[in-house]
Amino acid sequence: MSKPLVVQKYGGTSVGTMERIEYVADRIAKLRKTGINMVIVVSAMAGETDKLLKMARTLSKNPERREIDMLLSSGERISAALLALALQN
């Protein structure tokens, strides 16, 4: 019998500070110790997407979708990297 799979998504407020990221990492680590397989999805930290969009629109009134997608994905990648670092403890 296969182990259950749990998918958890943490929004910007949930990963908005280092303390919150540590809390999320602790939750994930505790659940993982039970043997459950997990998929974790994180958003950019609270307010980061808006900041990035504002920067883009300062430079271009009609930014290309490709560049916007790449720019905005950096917020999620930062959150994912910080969470991965927190999970190493």
Q: What residues fall within each predicted segment?
A:
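Nucleotide/pyrophosphate-binding catalytic subdomain
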Residues: 1-89
